A protein has these predicted regions:
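Solvent-exposed beta-strand/loop surfaces, strongest in extracytoplasmic domains of secreted
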Residues: 1-172
Length: 172
Protein backbone atom coordinates (compact mmCIF):
# COMPACT_ATOMS: atom_id res chain seq x y z
CA UNK A 1 0.00 0.00 0.00
CA UNK A 2 0.85 3.66 -0.19
CA UNK A 3 1.11 5.86 2.88
CA UNK A 4 1.73 9.60 3.30
CA UNK A 5 4.81 10.75 5.17
CA UNK A 6 4.07 14.07 6.83
CA UNK A 7 6.58 16.64 8.02
CA UNK A 8 6.05 19.27 10.69
CA UNK A 9 7.72 21.09 13.54
CA UNK A 10 10.13 23.50 11.94
CA UNK A 11 12.86 24.80 14.16
CA UNK A 12 16.12 26.49 13.53
CA UNK A 13 18.00 29.76 13.38
CA UNK A 14 16.18 32.31 11.23
CA UNK A 15 13.29 30.02 10.42
CA UNK A 16 10.90 32.86 11.08
CA UNK A 17 12.22 34.51 7.90
CA UNK A 18 10.61 31.79 5.82
CA UNK A 19 7.14 30.75 4.89
CA UNK A 20 7.48 27.01 5.41
CA UNK A 21 5.49 24.84 3.01
CA UNK A 22 5.05 21.24 4.06
CA UNK A 23 4.61 18.64 1.37
CA UNK A 24 4.01 15.01 2.27
CA UNK A 25 6.13 12.24 0.92
CA UNK A 26 4.93 8.78 0.05
CA UNK A 27 5.93 5.49 1.59
CA UNK A 28 5.18 2.49 -0.60
CA UNK A 29 5.08 -0.92 1.05
CA UNK A 30 5.41 -3.64 -1.55
CA UNK A 31 3.86 -7.07 -1.02
CA UNK A 32 6.18 -9.68 0.48
CA UNK A 33 6.97 -12.81 -1.51
CA UNK A 34 5.04 -15.93 -0.48
CA UNK A 35 5.47 -19.34 -2.07
CA UNK A 36 2.76 -21.97 -1.70
CA UNK A 37 3.78 -25.46 -2.79
CA UNK A 38 1.40 -28.38 -3.29
CA UNK A 39 2.62 -31.39 -1.31
CA UNK A 40 3.26 -34.63 -3.17
CA UNK A 41 0.47 -37.15 -2.60
CA UNK A 42 -0.43 -40.73 -3.50
CA UNK A 43 -3.59 -42.42 -4.66
CA UNK A 44 -4.72 -45.88 -5.73
CA UNK A 45 -5.89 -46.87 -9.20
CA UNK A 46 -9.68 -46.97 -9.29
CA UNK A 47 -10.16 -44.39 -6.52
CA UNK A 48 -10.89 -40.73 -7.15
CA UNK A 49 -7.95 -38.70 -5.82
CA UNK A 50 -8.89 -36.91 -2.58
CA UNK A 51 -6.47 -33.98 -2.50
CA UNK A 52 -8.27 -31.90 0.13
CA UNK A 53 -7.29 -28.28 0.81
CA UNK A 54 -4.52 -28.67 3.40
CA UNK A 55 -1.84 -30.59 1.48
CA UNK A 56 0.53 -27.68 0.97
CA UNK A 57 3.48 -25.88 2.49
CA UNK A 58 3.89 -22.11 2.70
CA UNK A 59 7.19 -20.27 2.77
CA UNK A 60 7.30 -16.56 3.59
CA UNK A 61 4.36 -15.88 5.94
CA UNK A 62 5.04 -13.01 8.35
CA UNK A 63 3.52 -11.33 11.41
CA UNK A 64 1.12 -14.12 12.33
CA UNK A 65 -0.53 -14.24 8.89
CA UNK A 66 -1.97 -17.66 8.05
CA UNK A 67 -3.26 -19.78 5.21
CA UNK A 68 -6.28 -21.89 6.11
CA UNK A 69 -6.70 -23.62 2.76
CA UNK A 70 -5.55 -23.86 -0.85
CA UNK A 71 -7.39 -25.20 -3.91
CA UNK A 72 -5.57 -28.35 -5.02
CA UNK A 73 -6.50 -29.88 -8.37
CA UNK A 74 -5.22 -32.60 -10.69
CA UNK A 75 -6.14 -34.00 -14.07
CA UNK A 76 -6.09 -37.51 -12.58
CA UNK A 77 -9.42 -39.25 -11.98
CA UNK A 78 -10.50 -42.61 -10.61
CA UNK A 79 -9.95 -44.08 -14.07
CA UNK A 80 -6.45 -42.65 -14.57
CA UNK A 81 -3.78 -45.29 -14.99
CA UNK A 82 -0.86 -45.98 -12.68
CA UNK A 83 1.71 -43.20 -12.99
CA UNK A 84 2.39 -39.60 -11.98
CA UNK A 85 0.17 -36.56 -12.48
CA UNK A 86 0.60 -32.90 -11.58
CA UNK A 87 -1.10 -31.25 -8.62
CA UNK A 88 -1.90 -27.57 -9.15
CA UNK A 89 -2.20 -25.20 -6.19
CA UNK A 90 -4.21 -21.96 -6.41
CA UNK A 91 -6.62 -19.69 -4.55
CA UNK A 92 -5.06 -19.57 -1.09
CA UNK A 93 -7.41 -18.29 1.62
CA UNK A 94 -6.49 -17.10 5.07
CA UNK A 95 -5.56 -14.07 7.16
CA UNK A 96 -3.41 -11.20 5.83
CA UNK A 97 -2.83 -12.67 2.37
CA UNK A 98 -3.43 -9.32 0.67
CA UNK A 99 0.05 -8.37 1.89
CA UNK A 100 1.76 -10.94 -0.32
CA UNK A 101 2.68 -11.61 -3.91
CA UNK A 102 1.80 -15.33 -3.96
CA UNK A 103 3.60 -17.77 -6.22
CA UNK A 104 2.24 -21.31 -6.53
CA UNK A 105 4.42 -24.37 -7.12
CA UNK A 106 3.03 -27.72 -8.31
CA UNK A 107 3.25 -31.07 -6.57
CA UNK A 108 3.06 -34.64 -7.87
CA UNK A 109 0.27 -37.17 -7.47
CA UNK A 110 1.47 -40.76 -7.79
CA UNK A 111 -1.25 -43.29 -8.64
CA UNK A 112 -0.22 -46.70 -7.28
CA UNK A 113 -1.61 -50.04 -8.50
CA UNK A 114 -4.80 -51.39 -6.99
CA UNK A 115 -4.65 -54.84 -5.40
CA UNK A 116 -5.95 -57.64 -7.64
CA UNK A 117 -6.42 -61.06 -6.08
CA UNK A 118 -6.63 -64.21 -8.21
CA UNK A 119 -7.67 -67.22 -6.14
CA UNK A 120 -7.28 -70.70 -7.60
CA UNK A 121 -10.29 -72.91 -7.02
CA UNK A 122 -10.28 -76.08 -4.96
CA UNK A 123 -11.46 -79.50 -6.01
CA UNK A 124 -11.25 -83.21 -5.32
CA UNK A 125 -10.23 -86.18 -7.41
CA UNK A 126 -10.11 -89.91 -6.78
CA UNK A 127 -6.82 -91.81 -6.83
CA UNK A 128 -6.28 -93.42 -10.23
CA UNK A 129 -8.70 -91.12 -12.10
CA UNK A 130 -7.82 -88.06 -14.15
CA UNK A 131 -7.23 -84.98 -12.06
CA UNK A 132 -9.41 -82.00 -12.85
CA UNK A 133 -7.99 -78.51 -12.82
CA UNK A 134 -10.30 -76.22 -10.91
CA UNK A 135 -11.04 -72.68 -12.10
CA UNK A 136 -10.26 -69.41 -10.40
CA UNK A 137 -11.89 -66.39 -8.86
CA UNK A 138 -10.82 -62.77 -9.39
CA UNK A 139 -11.50 -59.92 -6.96
CA UNK A 140 -10.41 -56.30 -6.91
CA UNK A 141 -11.05 -55.33 -10.52
CA UNK A 142 -12.22 -51.73 -11.02
CA UNK A 143 -13.27 -49.43 -13.85
CA UNK A 144 -14.68 -52.28 -15.93
CA UNK A 145 -11.26 -53.93 -16.26
CA UNK A 146 -11.23 -57.67 -16.93
CA UNK A 147 -8.92 -60.65 -16.63
CA UNK A 148 -9.14 -62.77 -19.76
CA UNK A 149 -6.51 -65.41 -19.15
CA UNK A 150 -5.23 -67.14 -16.04
CA UNK A 151 -3.23 -70.35 -16.14
CA UNK A 152 -4.29 -72.78 -13.42
CA UNK A 153 -2.29 -75.92 -12.75
CA UNK A 154 -1.75 -78.31 -9.92
CA UNK A 155 1.03 -80.61 -8.86
CA UNK A 156 -1.11 -83.77 -8.72
CA UNK A 157 -1.66 -86.45 -11.37
CA UNK A 158 -3.80 -89.60 -11.61
CA UNK A 159 -0.96 -91.58 -10.01
CA UNK A 160 -0.46 -89.20 -7.07
CA UNK A 161 -1.02 -90.61 -3.61
CA UNK A 162 -3.97 -89.33 -1.61
CA UNK A 163 -3.38 -85.96 0.07
CA UNK A 164 -3.53 -82.24 -0.48
CA UNK A 165 -1.76 -80.67 -3.46
CA UNK A 166 -1.19 -77.05 -4.38
CA UNK A 167 -3.29 -75.49 -7.12
CA UNK A 168 -1.47 -72.50 -8.60
CA UNK A 169 -2.63 -69.63 -10.75
CA UNK A 170 -0.41 -67.42 -12.90
CA UNK A 171 -0.39 -65.18 -15.93
CA UNK A 172 -3.14 -62.70 -15.00
Amino acid sequence: GRYDINVSGDAGSGISNYMVVYRPGTLTIDPAALTVTANDQTGIYGQTPALGTTGFTANGLLNGDTISGVNLTTTATGTSGVGTYGITASGAVGYGLGNYDITYQPGTLTIDPATLTVTAGSGTSVYGESVSTPGYKVSGLVNGDTVTTVSVDNTASSTSAGGDYAVNGSGA
